[in-house]
Amino acid sequence: MTLDYDILVIGGGHAGCEAASAAARMGSRTLLLTMDMTKLANMSCNPAVGGVAKGQIVREIDALGGRTARITDRTTLQFRMLNRSKGAAMWSPRAQCDKGRFSAEWRHELENTQNLYIWQDTAAELLFDTAGE
């Protein structure tokens, strides 16, 4: 394993996966450090993407080239439009996803991204030189 990377992303959660993917697609040699490669972008006990708040974030990330929305589309079990009894401004799409497939799709996506390397380990400390770099 080489230790020459432009960017190190610690944590393979949703944000870490998106950050590592974006950095690598922009041409930076990127290492994603995760504690468990089988649980990349692991979903909670309620494996939903969407809703009023998270749905807005997912749409913004998608507009910038993110991967969560595409992976959600591939792993959706059920789709609902929330708040239909309220005005159209409150409507919000939500997708229930297959937890295992969601993580597996993220892993496949990351493993096939040029300039992106994944390492399973734990970060114990961060070391800086005297210039703070």
Give the location of each predicted region.
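Beta1/beta-strand and adjacent pyrophosphate-binding region of the FAD-binding site
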Residues: 2-15
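Conserved N-terminal/central alpha/beta ligand/cofactor-binding core
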Residues: 21-129
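Short, hydrophobic/aromatic-rich segments at coil-to-beta transitions
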Residues: 132-133
